[in-house]
């Protein structure tokens, strides 16, 4: 979702207005994806590096996030009717506790939905995600939940917050990955467009999908996990939900 600030500058409005337009565009884009039967969408909403921006902008983005997640809670019945599951990936501990609570409530309230999963990379970088996944695996080795023979790139992929995308779209003319899903995109089709995110249209989305259809690689058959790996991964998943419940309870 790149280009919010440039959109604001282009239209001579405050940066905050550009970010609001960007969030509105996300809602619109999700409806298109639901109509098209796309089962999973991942957006890069806030990098850990974004904390280096001015305090005014970071505070404004935090308040915007609180407003939007509260709105999601207020409209949770509609979201559940649509079958949308929300998953926020990143270091939530870097945000104020009240925002952590809102995010946790939305994730818990939508955890059983299965029509479309919306992954929001928030307080996220690809390198940090890899670091945390490696830490989980090291802990598993220390606790003897897995053995050194179990550790391979397949296990690493499954220990990450986010799965492997088929298509990655970057808006606003940038041709960098900006530390996004670095491990997962080895087989991903990349699509770059000059369109600013708030101006992204259904036609831009369809153009990206056609690009994917023309360049999509052969489907790779997924490997089956051993019972030991399945148990380890289930523990990671259960721990995540327990942490969210703990945040809400505090």
Model-derived features: where do they sit?
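Flexible, compositionally biased loop and terminal segments
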Residues: 1-250
């Amino acid at each position: 979702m790149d280009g919010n600030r440039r959109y604001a500058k282009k239209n001579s409005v405050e940066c905050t207005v550009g970010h609001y337009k960007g969030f509105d565009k996300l809602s619109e884009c999700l409806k298109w994806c639901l109509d098209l039967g796309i089962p999973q969408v991942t957006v890069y909403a806030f990098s850990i590096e974004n904390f280096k921006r001015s305090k005014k902008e970071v505070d404004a983005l935090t308040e915007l996030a609180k407003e939007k997640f509260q709105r999601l809670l207020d409209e949770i019945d509609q979201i559940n009717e649509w079958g949308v599951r929300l998953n926020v990936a990143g270091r939530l501990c870097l945000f104020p506790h009240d925002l952590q609570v809102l995010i946790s409530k939305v994730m818990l309230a939508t955890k059983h939905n299965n029509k479309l999963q919306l992954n929001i990379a928030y307080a996220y970088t690809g390198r940090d995600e890899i670091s945390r996944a490696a830490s989980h695996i090291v802990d598993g080795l220390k606790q003897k939940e897995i053995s050194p023979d179990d550790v391979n790139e397949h296990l690493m992929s499954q220990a990450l917050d986010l799965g492997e995308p088929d298509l990655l779209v970057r808006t606003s003319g940038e041709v960098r990955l900006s530390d996004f899903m670095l491990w997962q995109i080895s087989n991903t089709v990349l699509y770059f467009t000059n369109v600013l995110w708030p101006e992204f249209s259904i036609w831009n989305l369809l153009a990206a999908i056609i690009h994917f259809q023309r360049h999509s690689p052969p489907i790779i058959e997924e490997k089956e996990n051993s019972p030991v790996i399945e148990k380890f991964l289930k523990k990671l998943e259960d721990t995540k939900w327990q942490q969210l419940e703990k945040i809400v309870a505090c």
